[in-house]
Amino acid sequence: MFHIRSLLLGVASAALIAGSALAKDDIVVALQLEPPHLDPTSAAAGAIDSVLYSNVFEGLTRFMGDGSIVPGLAESWEISDDGLTYTFKLHDGVTFHDGTTMDAEDVKFSLDRARAEDSVNAQKALYTGIANVEVIDPLTVKLTLSEPNGSLLFNLAWGDAVIVAPESIENIKQTPIGTGAFKFVNWVQGDKIELERNDAYWGDAPALAKATFKFISDPTAAFAAVMAEDVDVFAGFPAPENLPQFEADPRFQVLIGSTEGETILSINNALPPFDNVKVREAIAHAIDRQAIIDGAMFGYGTPIGTFFAPHNPAYVDLTSLSEYDPEKSRALLAEAG
């Protein structure tokens, strides 16, 4: 067994919004990455969630923009005193896009599928602690855990835990059917995915009638598309060096947020000289994380102190333990011999 010590950098995400988008009932959203397929429960690709999460598919809970957790398909829940039982009450009147009813049986199917022995869910480890999923009645489902897990509600908000209908699984990678505010319409691979408003949505009706996701991988083409206003929004704009120009242009808004993306530089602590803790501490103090962020991402990023992004409930800021200090680094190397 070996141990890993890492340099951690949190990656910021920039979204550009054209002012003209605010007065339309349709929107064109540009993304750099195209999904490999459209089943968020069977691949690690974040590009799937970028298009489908909360738009087409929903989970029992969901993320807000600040990383907090709010009810999704579950309107409420109760947690037993020992932390082993979660009882979820589902919203009544929820239907899938094919008109069939979403109920506790669909929740059981989805979670059992995610945690099954043969599951290909990219986050399967998050759900293996669920020992049993029991349908109490059509609107009530009970989860029993093998041990308490304070992150369960957070884990259930991931795109990997969205609720799907058993009948839709065969074609889910090409024609996804969910419960969200938008329905899948069309996918022109290499170009775009089109969604339309779900008029039978159980929640607040969306203001938009149509949403188109365009895939533009080349930074130069991305810049040109924004400047020509061919797109209304570019989420995760791939060329941060262009952001000051957009910020100075009254046609656009630039929004900076956080992502689950971390840049991690790791070393093998079992091999000399890295098996010496003083050498590892010296390396940590020799690296200017902010300078890397400034150079590689033009300042759009955050030095982080754990393996989690700052909005994750498990995040602990330990950056003070490895602050950039060349003199201290040299002294530690001298002590290490």
What is each PLM-predicted segment?
Residues 89, 123-164:
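Surface-exposed binding/hinge segments that line
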Residues 197, 275-337:
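Append "and occasionally in soluble cytosolic enzymes with long acidic Gly/Pro-rich linkers
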Residues 25, 243-256:
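Ligand-binding "clamshell"
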Residues 25-33, 75, 85-88, 107-110, ...:
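Short, well-ordered beta-strand elements
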Residues 148, 154-206, 210, 218, ...:
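Gly/Pro-rich hinge or "lid" segments in bacterial periplasmic/extracellular proteins
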Residues 170, 198-244:
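Ligand-site clamp/hinge motif
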Residues 75-120, 136, 142, 225, ...:
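Aromatic- and charge-enriched surface segment that lines or borders ligand/interaction sites
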Residues 31-81, 112, 177-179:
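N-terminal lobe/hinge region of extracytoplasmic solute-binding protein
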